[in-house]
Regions:
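CE4/NodB-like, metal-dependent polysaccharide N-deacetylase domain
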Residues: 119-146, 226-240
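Short, well-structured secondary-structure segments
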Residues: 3-8, 14-116, 140-143, 163-168, ...
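Active-site and substrate-binding clefts of carbohydrate-active enzymes
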Residues: 1-46, 60, 181-183, 187-191, ...
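Acidic, His- and aromatic-enriched active-site or binding-groove loops in soluble protein domains
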Residues: 87-104, 121, 125, 137, ...
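An acidic- and aromatic-residue-enriched active-site/binding cleft used to recognize and process polar
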Residues: 8-13, 73-75, 107-110, 144-154, ...
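Intrinsically disordered, polybasic Lys/Arg-rich low-complexity tracts
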Residues: 430-492
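Generic structural signal for well-ordered alpha-helices
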Residues: 52-56, 88-92, 121-131, 154, ...
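Short, charged, surface-exposed secondary-structure boundary motifs
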Residues: 113-115, 173-181, 203-205, 285
Length: 492
């Protein structure tokens, strides 16, 4: 039996807001809510909702003959709950059909597998729990962030209970081998490995609407013909895509939804191929050999390695600084700090710091909120500096940090008390002041004439009496003399 495996990745990071140096220590909220919500609504309306609706219609039409596979990051599910719960509901409807498989990955869509095994396990377990909670299914297959994989990572996830992984069929690891077969892990042969056919996958993901492409336009009929050629000497065609291919990276006007609508019909009508999930393929096929991947691979960029996230000094510095906090994070019980820890681990933050150019640079610009890799680095490190201050308070690193944390707690409590007392003082001032002012006004109106006039005029009256008395005596003497002179004149 020859199969086609359609797998779609769904992920949106919590994008960070512009965080300045002067915000450090003062602002502990790091996310651009407006940008995150607007992008989620945009992608939901252009991709997730119409694509899910179409897939549900196809499953109803073709039943178990049409099957697809998804991986949805934990951070994406968080944002669905916040901004677009209808998207989560549409995925639930797909899960209920029994024709859709959901894969496990790290909750944060992170690169933690390269730093700490315990944290890696916790994130995978948390993601698995979320899938069970929201979609009522239990993942049996693992996919690394951006299909990152190595022999060592494969062996680790096998021990976690995942006997099947999916990854990239990179040229430098395949050599003469074909990605159209099932393989096994080089360290643990019990683990089965499905490899992405990157040529057929990229025809849809990147070249579908490219009018300068020699094969443009790509029809469902032509594409099925290419799959038939690939499976002449193969057993499975693994078509792994970013789900935003439908409606976002390739617009509705490009005809991508019409392509998806007619694709199952062309396959089922003109070939004997079966659509299958990774679990079904691993159950029905046997590995042809081991695939050796001593160094990590991914599906990103031309190199198919980790350079998209860890390819320059900026990325390495930020990455190492973040994971140097792991041991203390594991001792932390502050819920807000732990939530930020999950969101700050998203691989996208390091992806935005990439200095790659040309064709890969165009891909790196998708939903990138920063003007340059250096802006992304500075912004992230400012946030990380504030995060470390908070972590030092919650989980001191040494005796000095312990003392500082204690003092910081005391200062915090004192500031709270001061704010309380200042509020009480202000309240007291506002109350009595109004009453006093009213009484004073009333008193002034009724008592001003008698009290203030008498008090101020009394000295003046005393002074006036002293000066008037001599004048009165002189006037009397003058009058007496005139009277005597008049009498004397009459006598004569």
């Amino acid at each position: 039996m020859k199969t086609i495996c359609l797998y779609f990745q769904v992920h949106q990071p919590m994008r960070l807001k512009r965080y300045r140096f002067f915000n450090i220590g003062n602002d502990h909220y790091y996310y651009d809510d407006y940008l995150n919500e607007s992008i989620m609504h945009k992608v939901a309306n252009k991709c997730y909702l119409p694509a899910n609706k179409l897939l549900l219609q196809l499953i109803k039409e073709y039943g178990t003959n049409f099957k697809v596979t998804f991986s949805i990051s934990g951070i994406a599910m968080d944002q669905f709950r916040l901004y677009a719960p209808e998207v989560l509901d549409s995925f639930k409807k797909l899960a209920e059909t029994g024709c859709v498989e959901f894969l496990a990955e790290t909750y944060s869509h992170s690169l933690v597998a390269f730093k700490n095994d315990e944290e890696f396990r916790k994130q995978v377990e948390l993601h698995t729990d979320r899938i069970k909670e929201f979609l009522n299914v239990e993942p049996k297959v693992f996919r690394g962030t951006e299909l990152i994989y190595s022999d060592e990572i494969g062996a680790k996830v096998f021990d976690m209970g995942f006997p099947i992984v999916v990854t990239e069929g990179a040229k430098h690891i395949m050599g003469w081998k074909s990605s159209n077969f099932l393989y096994c892990n080089a360290i643990n042969p019990k683990q089965k490995v499905l490899l992405r056919n990157y040529e057929l996958s990229d025809d849809l993901a990147f070249r579908f609407s490219n009018q300068s492409w020699a094969e443009y336009p790509l029809t469902a009929e032509k594409y099925v013909g290419w799959i038939s050629e690939a499976l002449e000497n193969g057993e499975t065609a693994n078509l792994f895509l970013d789900y935003e291919t439908f409606g976002e990276h390739q617009s509705k006007e490009s005809g991508i939804f019409d392509f998806l609508k007619h694709f199952p019909k062309e396959v089922l009508k003109k070939t004997s191929f079966k659509f299958a999930t990774p679990s079904e393929i691993a159950e029905k096929l046997q590995p042809v050999s081991a695939v050796s991947v001593p160094h990590p691979i991914s599906w990103a960029d031309e190199e198919r390695d980790l350079t998209a996230w860890l390819g320059n000094d900026l990325q390495e510095d930020a990455f190492n600084k973040l994971y140097s906090l792991t041991e203390r994070i594991q001792k932390c019980e502050d819920k807000k700090i732990l939530i930020d820890w999950k969101y700050l681990q998203s691989s996208d933050h390091f992806y935005y710091m990439s200095t790659k150019v040309f064709s890969d640079g165009e891909v790196h610009s998708y939903f990138n909120p920063f003007d340059s890799p250096y802006d992304a680095y500075i912004n992230y490190m400012n946030i990380l500096s504030d995060f470390i201050i908070r972590l030092n308070s919650a989980v001191p690193e040494n005796q000095k940090d312990q003392e500082l944390a204690t003092l910081a707690a005391i200062i915090f409590d004192k500031n709270k008390q001061i704010e309380k007392y200042e509020a009480e003082i202000l309240k007291l001032k506002k109350g009595p002041l109004k009453t006093t002012s009213s009484k004073a006004t009333k008193k002034t109106v009724t008592t001003k004439p008698p009290s203030k006039t008498v008090a101020k005029k009394a000295p003046a009256k005393a002074k006036t009496s002293k000066t008037v008395q001599p004048k009165t005596a002189t006037k009397k003497k003058t009058t007496a003399k005139k009277a005597a002179a008049t009498k004397k004149a009459k006598t004569k």
